[in-house]
């Protein structure tokens, strides 16, 4: 199966797994998905993630191998409330949103985190302000 928008796919899978309070979620392995997982792990939104190969028999004797990422989600307390409260896509394929580093302001008391795609790779809004670079505003995490 091919996905057009891998960022939305990653966000939707994580959001749905959080709603169902699953321990882990399976993502298709792309460079963008790995970058998102690194940011989520560094900021403490997930426990861990790892890559693995999954092979399946299709179309007679051909063997297709697909790489996946397993993300171990993080919850708080006995009631297992998710660490990720809100995951919202901002820049979409039909409507791109670009920002300069001067236009990145702290919001919601510093709780909300923005992820940008820049020439230096995927970075958070804090890092973008620190380095003085702007880029495409992909999504926000709360």
Curated annotation (Swiss-Prot):
Pfam families: Ribosomal_S8 (PF00410)
Protein name per its UniProtKB record: Small ribosomal subunit protein uS8c
Compartments (UniProt record): Plastid
Recorded name of the encoding gene: rps8
Keywords (A to Z) from UniProt: Plastid, Ribonucleoprotein, Ribosomal protein, RNA-binding, rRNA-binding
Origin species: Euglena longa (Euglenophycean alga)
Chief location category: plastid
GO CC aspect terms: plastid; ribonucleoprotein complex; ribosome
Record's keyword annotation contains Nuclease: no
């Amino acid at each position: 199966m091919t996905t057009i928008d891998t960022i939305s796919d990653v966000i939707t899978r994580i959001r749905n797994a959080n709603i169902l309070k699953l321990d882990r979620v399976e993502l298709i392995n792309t460079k963008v998905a790995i970058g998102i997982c690194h940011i989520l792990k560094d900021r403490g939104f997930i426990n861990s993630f790892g890559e693995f190969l999954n092979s399946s028999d299709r179309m007679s004797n051909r063997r297709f191998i697909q790489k996946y990422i397993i993300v171990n989600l993080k919850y708080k307390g006995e009631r297992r409330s998710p660490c990720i409260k809100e995951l919202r896509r901002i820049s979409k394929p039909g409507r791109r949103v670009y920002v300069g580093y001067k236009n990145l302001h702290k919001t919601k008391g510093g709780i909300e985190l923005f992820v940008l795609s820049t020439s230096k790779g995927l970075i958070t809004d804090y890092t973008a302000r620190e380095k003085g670079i702007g880029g495409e505003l992909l999504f926000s995490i709360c």
